[in-house]
């Protein structure tokens, strides 16, 4: 029965999608069966969609035949978000259009633009794309936003949720909505009143529960990308704003993101970084807390296992804090460095505090930080998981 549904779906999409953009052969299905992670699911059909109209029709037909759909942009996810054993819709190449507002403070992006490319576009205007995951040179906007991939510098103050202004989406039944367009909102409100009423009902239910509302605020004051994003129900009154921000971190489970308008951030032209070494992790953590009110833009803690994984020879059992400061002028940068040194004066560092403003030097520090995840993973002893050894798992088998 299921096979018949896929065959019927294939027949119908063949009427508007060229054959060279539909993959059903064994070899290519195998190739598309994995992303950057180590999971594998073999899709039944892979479709390279060209535009929003095609996606809308593809989803409407999938809804008609009750067939699951997964979306993929670059496929740099590590947790299997962009693999499928059903229908895989790819929106990478040909989804690279963008527009910038006259004041350069907003940028509208299609999902197939690589994050680093967005920064290249904005750099001449002194602006940047705030989310900066380690995979920013490969990850595309669609995946960055839908996975709420934040990265090393944007923290929670400038992640996708904070930067998003509006979204153009396609719902599971093929319905299109642009939350930033009054006409689209009006049409959606007219045709989907019960849907909007349900959003409002959930919003009010959450807000009327003070304990739950406080817990949500607390959870999202720190990095939190687990599960669906509940913060919009607490923050926004307008149901369309709630819908737009629900997309962030939804991993494509709620809708297809065909376009997103986001705030841009000021790009400081001068920066300096230092690798600060402490004899123990407690001192390192205390130093991070002390630096928080200062002109510190990022402080990344690298524990002894992380340092060992990249063959750091400074010492054994140390903890490092990779620290960065930025400024608009060289004078401001030097003043920032001196202020940070003053803040750290009560702390004993293993090596003298040395900030470098040379890109060829500090880029090596950040390259180390970006590569920590696979480096640490490579040191894991075979037969172990991140928490429990396989032998212990077997001991509890029934």
Language model region names:
Residues 152, 156, 162-165, 278-280, ...:
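Phosphate/diphosphate-binding loops
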Residues 19-26, 72, 129-133, 206-227, ...:
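Flexible, glycine/charged-enriched surface loops at secondary-structure junctions
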Residues 97-100, 107-111, 115-288, 293:
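FAD-binding subdomain of flavoenzyme oxidoreductases
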Residues 8-19, 57, 61-65, 121, ...:
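Generic non-transmembrane alpha-helical segments
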